[in-house]
A protein has these predicted regions:
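A surface-exposed regulatory interaction patch that couples sensing to output
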Residues: 207-224
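Asp-box/WD-like beta-propeller blade repeats and closely related beta-sheet repeat scaffolds
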Residues: 95-116, 123, 137-164
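Flexible glycine/proline-rich, aromatic-decorated loop/lid segments
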Residues: 259-276
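Aromatic (Trp/Tyr) and acidic
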Residues: 1-63, 67, 71, 101-134, ...
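Extracellular Ig-like/FN3 beta-sandwich strand-entry sites
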Residues: 421, 474-476
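Substrate-binding cleft and catalytic face of glycoside hydrolase catalytic domains
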Residues: 83, 88-97, 129-130
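C-terminal beta-rich recognition modules with glycine/proline-rich loops and embedded aromatic residues
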Residues: 4, 247, 312-320, 325-415, ...
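Long, well-ordered core segments of solenoidal/helical folds
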Residues: 1-27, 72-89, 142-158, 194-212, ...
Length: 620
């Protein structure tokens, strides 16, 4: 869904072309779009690079798309590099601005210009471009080092104290520093990691909106802008041990007081951010980018603590809050993801989610396996073939065959190049990590577990079963995760969900839609729910079937597939919790040049939205 066509025009790659002209002393146009618009281009480059590393397995559409990506990268990369200033600085809004307007870079009065936000996305795009080319094309990598060196030369102890209004540079610098060390050795990237910590430590005497209200070590409640917050917490979890007390408290506050059942965050009271504890309005916020940030945070926590509960949660967020952020054709997207109402749009005046959604989804292989403690952690169950390098001195191919999340049977073939002894840690899903929600019936553990047909003892530690043995090519792990329809009740402190129930099957949260039943504001009946596969519906989904209290049939579909059918216009409002609009500059389409076209109608309280809800009335 990454719109390379829309990044061609104003606010896109053209800004780099004009900045290069300015650096050459040629006549040029001014910067177009938001001051941080470079970020959309960098996100798009990163997404194209990751997508180009996917094995198409002969799929003609994927091959065609990858050819288009290569053509676009060949066009864009020289333009991006040409816009980099001689000292390594890169942000076209500054290069193209009057120095009377912005007399200095890294100005504390101009934190909203997002210098680190755009620079961080550039660095992350360079990492993936280097990886895509197997280090054969170092153009972006070298440019990213030049940029990072520029920041190190200007910011740091004894130089200048500063922090950005929108975090991203911090986690990018940590990632890049470690990547440079892996590629070049000798601690070449250490200065970048140190700068990341310095930028975090500079955050104080500011606003809770951008998490600078108190030093990061003293932050224990998630506040402010949800995307900025999760990027901040992700970097904290990754970079230093002395942040861990705060990080654990922040994680606990999010998951047990500010976490939607879909895995989304941010109820919107604080301008695209967190509200008070237990304030989880169903018509509100849940920005797609905040879900991306939460996934990054959960992943970093999983890396730090090797506890499966973090993977349980990023699986929830991935399947529900993020996967459903696009329509099934990948042509429209949600900037916000309210649990009732809302319609996707083709573009937005601030299209940060357009690049963030695909780059995060394309990182699924990263979320699936983690290598550490002399073994391999299996965190997600997805039919796939992935190579894990240097496990106990050998490379290991992991082949998963599964229809999860439609059923719970999983087979993993372990193919080390050479027979070696190591552990494979199998995640045992737990749907009860958040204290905000209780499920009926309770489901836990594994139904069975075997290696090469021989039953294994199921002993769970921190959410994993460790299977340690001398592995040889062809060894097969087989297990089954129990999958039954469940009803979910929310903590009574969540006023918006009192008297309501949600439905779940495995990791999937379900919606009821007017496309399947006319009245979705009535109470659900007490009859058992049944899972039924519908290959003819929404590209193939497992539906849940039951009865409403009046005996009429009830059909529920996975939340990710919501609002993909025509004719869903009227908002379904449950318990007086109405849809809240955050679309702002959302547009229903674009002009040929990629600029915004017809504005979508604003939807305030009680306005139009989709006939689809997560929470439905419980039978009293």
């Amino acid at each position: 869904m990454n719109r390379t066509d829309l990044n061609q025009g104003a606010g896109g790659i053209d800004n780099f072309v004009e900045a290069a002209k300015a650096l050459r002393g040629e006549p040029h146009k001014g910067h177009k779009g938001l001051v941080f618009a470079n970020a959309w281009v960098h996100q798009t480059v990163e997404s194209m690079c990751i997508a180009s590393m996917v094995d198409p397995k002969g799929d003609a559409d994927i091959i065609k798309a990858q050819e288009k990506f290569k053509e676009t990268l060949d066009d864009w990369i020289p333009k991006i590099i040409a816009a980099q200033e001689p000292d390594g600085y890169l942000q076209t809004a500054y290069t193209l601005s009057s120095r009377n307007r912005w007399p200095s870079k890294w100005n504390p009065d101009q934190r909203a210009n997002h210098e680190g936000y755009t620079a961080g996305y550039f660095i992350e795009s360079a990492i993936n471009h280097y990886t895509m080319t197997d280090g054969q094309d170092k153009r972006l990598y070298d440019a990213a080092k030049k940029l990072a060196d520029c920041w190190v030369a200007n910011l740091g102890p004894g130089k200048k104290e500063w922090f950005d209004g929108h975090q991203e540079m911090e986690q990018a610098l940590v990632r890049f520093g470690r990547f440079v060390n892996d590629m070049e050795g000798n601690g070449r990237g250490d200065s970048y990691v140190k700068l990341a910590k310095f930028l975090l430590d500079c955050r104080s005497n500011g606003s809770d909106y951008d998490q600078s209200h108190v030093p990061v070590q003293q932050q224990y409640e998630a506040v402010g802008h949800a995307v900025r917050a999760t990027y901040n917490y992700s970097a904290m979890a990754d970079v230093a041990a002395d942040y861990q007390s705060a990080v654990l408290s922040l994680w606990d506050n999010i998951v047990n007081k500010k976490y939607y059942v879909t895995g989304g965050i941010g109820s919107g009271e604080s301008a695209e951010g967190f509200g008070p504890n237990y304030s989880l309005r169903n018509g509100a916020y849940c920005e797609s980018c905040s879900t991306c940030g939460l996934i990054f945070f959960q992943w970093k926590m999983n890396l730090a603590y090797h506890d499966a509960k973090y993977a349980d949660l990023y699986e929830e967020s991935m399947y529900n809050a993020l996967l459903g952020a696009t329509d099934l054709e990948g042509k429209t997207f949600y900037y916000t993801n309210p649990l009732q109402g809302g319609q996707r749009t083709a573009w937005h005046v601030c299209p940060c989610c357009v690049g963030n959604i695909p780059r995060t989804l394309l990182m699924v292989p990263t979320w699936t396996y983690v290598k550490d403690n002399g073994g391999i952690y299996v965190n997600m169950y997805i039919g796939s073939t992935i190579n894990v390098e240097k496990v106990a001195g050998t490379d290991v191919q992991m082949v998963q065959k599964t229809e999860y999340p439609w059923n719970g049977k999983v087979a993993i073939t372990v193919n080390p190049k050479a027979s070696r002894r190591f552990a494979v840690y199998v995640r045992v899903p737990d749907r009860t990590t958040s204290e905000l929600y209780t499920t009926t019936p309770k489901v836990s553990g594994l139904k069975s577990l075997s290696v090469n047909g021989k039953a294994e003892t199921i002993k769970v530690d921190k959410g994993y079963v460790a299977i340690t043995r001398d592995w040889k090519a062809g060894d097969k792990i087989e297990f089954e995760i129990p999958m039954v329809p469940q009803r979910i009740k929310a903590d009574q402190n969540i006023e918006a969900d009192r008297g309501l129930v949600a439905l779940r099957y495995g990791p999937l949260i379900y919606n009821v839609e007017r496309a399947d039943q006319a009245n979705i504001t009535q109470a659900i009946g007490s009859d058992p729910l049944v899972a039924e596969w519908r290959g003819d519906l929404l590209g193939g989904v497992m539906t849940l079937k039951g009865k409403w209290a009046d005996g009429s049939p009830l059909v529920a579909i996975p939340n990710y597939a919501r609002n993909n059918r025509l004719g869903q216009v009227a908002t379904a409002t449950v318990a007086g919790d109405s849809t809240i609009d955050y679309s702002g500059g959302a547009t229903t389409g674009t002009t040929g040049s990629g600029t915004a076209a017809t504005p979508a109608p604003r939807r305030g309280r009680g306005g139009a939205g989709g006939g689809s809800v997560v929470w439905i009335r419980d039978q009293q």
